[in-house]
């Protein structure tokens, strides 16, 4: 007989961690180049040779004013755009130029964030067992996960997973995957990286496609990295910042075509329907009920909140629907204001902002003094990721 049921059970148990997955370190990075939102309409219409479209420019100014964004970081500089006029047209073939940027710059920006996370973690990088890399910016083989592994000098046997073109919900997806990897592989330390560069979506204005213009007013560049692991080695200085208790993904009903993107010769084209905020706010309580019923929690103001800041209208509608106090979305709105919509990286930036503000304010936990929290990712599908978080004492 090759083996017994008891020995298989013992092997299975030995392979799995004892405790929940925790976020052990966070690092973020942005390109040095940044634009002030108040000045962006003038810059955008000038660089795209669209200043004759005066009515559309006024409309774009109003979009930027309503965005609640103060500044955004962007890899694309004025000099580069002048050298690549096809990227400034509304629908000119330009995929090669865009790909040449993101194939190099997405892993590089991801490395910047990863180096910071590894430094905070304080352990040798040889302890990293898994890499999960996510970007909506471009596609390549071997992927950005491979490039990052080389840039950081990780072990060639590190187990890699590459996620391309998932969109804004994917910050929640990488946490869900990292949780499963950490809890089902004893001793696993998962490096999670989300790196986004808008070079694939930047284009000039069109008065017949205003949804494209909305993206030009919101999207920005940034990368965030986490180290995720279960059973922290306290003797080595490991300590969780947040613990992940559960994670779920769902497709919202009647939401086909609400958000979608397509890779074309002109780059990635995005389409957003006006009822996206309504669709999310209408369905969010069901996701909350399912996530928090096992914990007996139904007071949404008792939670700390990390929500993907798709735009102020989504946050406003969610607040109104759930009766949330204004301070619940403080960390989310701060990241939207200072960085814009960085797609998948946003929720990881918000985690970082929340733990830093909690430390600065001297509250009891990393979750603004509260014990339980929720992280939401929203994106194409319309897909929603829901992660239940547990804070730790500061």
UniProtKB/Swiss-Prot annotation:
One of its GO terms (molecular function) is naringenin-chalcone synthase activity. It is an enzyme of class 2 (transferase). It comes from the Eukaryota. It catalyses: (E)-4-coumaroyl-CoA + 3 malonyl-CoA + 3 H(+) = 2',4,4',6'-tetrahydroxychalcone + 3 CO2 + 4 CoA. Gene3D superfamilies: 3.40.47.10. SUPFAM superfamilies: Thiolase-like. Keywords: Acyltransferase, Flavonoid biosynthesis, Transferase. The active site is at residue 168. Its EC number is 2.3.1.74. GO terms for biological process: flavonoid biosynthetic process; polyketide biosynthetic process. The keyword Transferase applies. The keyword Hydrolase does not apply. Pathway: Secondary metabolite biosynthesis; flavonoid biosynthesis. InterPro entries: Chalcone/stilbene_synt_C, Chalcone/stilbene_synt_N, Chalcone/stilbene_synthase_AS, Polyketide_synthase_type-III, Thiolase-like. Belongs to the thiolase-like superfamily. Chalcone/stilbene synthases family. The primary product of this enzyme is 4,2',4',6'-tetrahydroxychalcone (also termed naringenin-chalcone or chalcone) which can under specific conditions spontaneously isomerize into naringenin. This is Chalcone synthase. The gene is CHS.
């Amino acid at each position: 007989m090759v083996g017994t049921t008891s020995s298989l059970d013992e092997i299975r148990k030995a392979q799995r961690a004892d405790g929940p997955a925790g976020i052990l370190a966070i690092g973020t990075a942005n390109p040095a180049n940044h634009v002030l939102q108040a000045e962006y309409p003038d810059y955008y219409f000038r660089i795209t040779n669209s200043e004759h479209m005066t009515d559309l420019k006024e409309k774009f100014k109003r979009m930027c004013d309503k965005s609640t964004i103060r500044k955004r970081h962007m890899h694309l500089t004025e000099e580069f755009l002048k050298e690549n006029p096809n990227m400034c047209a509304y629908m000119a073939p330009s995929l090669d130029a865009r790909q040449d940027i993101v194939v190099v710059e997405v892993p590089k920006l991801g490395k910047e964030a990863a180096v910071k996370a590894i430094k905070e973690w304080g352990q040798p990088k040889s302890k990293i067992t898994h890499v999960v890399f996510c970007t909506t910016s471009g596609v390549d083989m071997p992927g950005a996960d491979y490039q990052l592994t080389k840039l950081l000098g990780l072990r060639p046997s590190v187990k890699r997973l590459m996620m391309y073109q998932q969109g804004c919900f994917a910050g929640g997806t990488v946490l869900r995957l990292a949780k499963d990897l950490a809890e089902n592989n004893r001793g696993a330390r998962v490096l999670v990286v989300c790196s986004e560069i808008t070079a694939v979506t930047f284009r000039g204005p069109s008065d017949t496609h205003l949804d494209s213009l909305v993206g030009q007013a919101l999207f920005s560049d940034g990368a965030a990295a986490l180290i995720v692991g279960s059973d922290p080695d306290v003797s080595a200085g490991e300590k969780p910042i947040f613990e992940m208790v559960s994670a779920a993904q769902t497709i919202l009903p009647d939401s086909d075509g609400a958000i979608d993107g397509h890779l074309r010769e002109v780059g990635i084209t995005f389409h957003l329907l006006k009822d996206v905020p309504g669709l999310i706010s209408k369905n969010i309580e069901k996701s909350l009920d399912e996530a928090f019923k096992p914990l007996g929690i139904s007071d949404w103001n008792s939670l700390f909140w990390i929500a993907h800041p798709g735009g102020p209208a989504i946050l406003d509608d969610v607040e109104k629907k759930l009766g949330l106090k204004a301070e619940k979305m403080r960390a989310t709105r701060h990241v939207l204001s200072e960085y814009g919509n960085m797609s998948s990286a946003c929720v990881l930036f918000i985690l970082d902002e929340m733990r830093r503000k909690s430390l600065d304010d001297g509250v009891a936990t990393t979750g603004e003094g509260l014990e339980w929290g929720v992280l939401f990712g929203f994106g194409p599908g319309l897909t929603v990721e829901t992660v239940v978080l547990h804070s730790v004492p500061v």
